[in-house]
């Protein structure tokens, strides 16, 4: 897998007074955070959330909006229960998937020693005491199936010290309904202690509701297996890394249908960040790093033919396509950012093959600022390799003047 080294040269401004002001740390708290909810079931609108920092209350205020996919004025709404079907409901609507934390192991002193009822000390005898900033307090997130009519809940990992979703960053993408609603597919790393902490061997498991049995679908792969998703025809795709213990390995899209497994991106020298099945079940849209940015791609699914999957880059520019919200009749809704713009919703048109901005939550804020200029440069290293460098020039940059320079170099295998 190709590795990238990025360097950003940020040139600090002079503080001169201009018609517009330059960005300050305090200004950052005025930026509205746009988060997509999804395309409505009718397919003609997008629901999204706008979160604004509240400095006085030390909190965040959120509002919901709906906007036509063709463009227009956003409309504030109170909820979207009648607009978007809950994806965690079974196809027949009788059961619902959700996750919650369950106490499994005793870790606190007061749990291990009953005479120390006030002890909040954490006691560990092996690794897996913390992942990033998340401490293992003896509780594990488990997936549950809830009977909508009776409220009865089934813990798919009852009594087991395993996580689903995965800690610390996993979410609802770690568990989905099977196509017929009779089974649940979930991601879990069924290891404990030091073995859990040093392994990347997550697997995708199938839980059958009728027999209450569990089957490991990805037992043959010893690296990460994550993000299971089904096409409208019932084929399952997921993200897979081959090398056990190497959490920055190349991420591929693998498809399983009728017992036949195909790696759609094995021949492609890039790594996949996330993906979504096309409505036609013949293509998969995905996002991946490309030359210092993150772009939108499409790969076809040739099923069981000997044809090499064809990969097409759909977007290109000095911006990142961060996520795919959904497909509508004629295109995709995605989120996009750049070094001068926070997240906004964009519409990708299949015919024009262009991105068009859909939401404009921060336009007034940007228009009040003198923004920096961003330049992309490729520099030859001593060993003849190309190194990407982002040069960020301050607002009102004067090439005849000298400026203090800040060098920011980001390396390591996990840089995008």
Model-derived features with residue positions:
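Residue-level detector of Asp-centered blade-edge/turn motifs that repeat once per structural unit
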Residues: 41-42, 91-92, 179-180, 231-233, ...
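A flexible loop/linker signature enriched in serine peptidases of the S9 family
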Residues: 50-63, 78-85, 99-142, 159-171, ...
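Short loop/turn segments that connect beta-strands within beta-propeller blades
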Residues: 68-72, 147-151, 208-212, 257-260, ...
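Serine-hydrolase catalytic core recognition
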Residues: 322-416
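Hydrophobic beta-strand positions that form the internal "hydrophobic ladder"
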Residues: 43-47, 96, 184, 234-237, ...
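Conserved beta-strand position repeated once per blade in WD40 beta-propeller domains
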Residues: 36, 86, 174, 227, ...
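Beta-strand-rich domains and repeat architectures in extracellular enzymes and scaffolds
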Residues: 26-60
């Amino acid at each position: 897998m190709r590795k990238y080294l990025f360097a950003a040269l940020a040139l600090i401004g002079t503080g001169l007074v201009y018609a517009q002001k330059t960005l300050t740390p305090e200004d950052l708290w005025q930026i509205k955070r746009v988060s997509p909810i999804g395309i409505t079931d009718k397919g003609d609108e997008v629901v999204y959330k706008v979160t604004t920092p509240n400095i006085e209350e030390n909190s965040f205020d959120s509002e919901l909006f709906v906007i036509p996919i063709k463009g227009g004025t956003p409309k504030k709404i109170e909820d979207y229960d009648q607009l978007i079907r809950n994806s965690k409901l079974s196809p027949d609507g009788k059961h619902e998937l959700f996750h919650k934390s369950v106490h499994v192991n005793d870790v606190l002193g007061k749990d291990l020693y009953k005479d120390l009822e006030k002890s909040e000390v954490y006691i560990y005898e092996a690794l897996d005491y913390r992942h990033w900033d998340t401490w293992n307090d003896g509780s594990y997130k488990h997936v549950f199936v809830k009977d909508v009519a009776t409220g009865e809940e089934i813990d798919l990992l009852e009594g087991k010290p395993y996580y689903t979703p995965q800690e610390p960053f996993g979410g609802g993408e770690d568990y989905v309904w099977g196509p017929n609603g009779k089974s649940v597919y979930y991601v879990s790393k069924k290891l404990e202690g030091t073995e859990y902490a040093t392994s990347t061997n997550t697997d995708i498991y199938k839980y059958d509701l009728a027999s209450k049995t569990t089957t490991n679908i990805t037992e043959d792969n010893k690296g990460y297996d994550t993000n299971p998703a089904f096409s409208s025809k019932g084929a399952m795709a997921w993200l897979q890394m081959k090398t056990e213990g190497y959490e920055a390995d190349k991420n591929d899209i693998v498809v399983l249908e009728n017992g036949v497994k195909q790696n759609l991106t094995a021949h492609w020298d890039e790594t996949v960040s996330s993906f979504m099945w096309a409505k036609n079940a013949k293509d998969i849209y995905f996002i991946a790093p490309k030359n210092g940015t993150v772009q939108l791609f499409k790969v076809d699914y040739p099923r069981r033919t000997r044809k090499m999957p064809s990969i097409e880059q759909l977007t290109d520019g000095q911006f990142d396509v961060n996520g795919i919200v959904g497909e509508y009749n004629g295109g995709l809704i995605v989120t996009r950012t750049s070094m001068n713009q926070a997240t906004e919703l964009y519409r990708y048109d299949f015919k024009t093959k262009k991105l068009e901005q859909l939401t404009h939550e921060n336009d007034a804020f940007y228009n009040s600022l003198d923004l920096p200029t961003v330049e992309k440069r490729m520099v030859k290293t001593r060993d003849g390799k190309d190194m990407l460098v982002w040069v960020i020039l301050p607002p009102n940059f004067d090439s005849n003047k000298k400026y203090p320079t800040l060098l920011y170099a980001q390396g390591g295998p996990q840089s995008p």
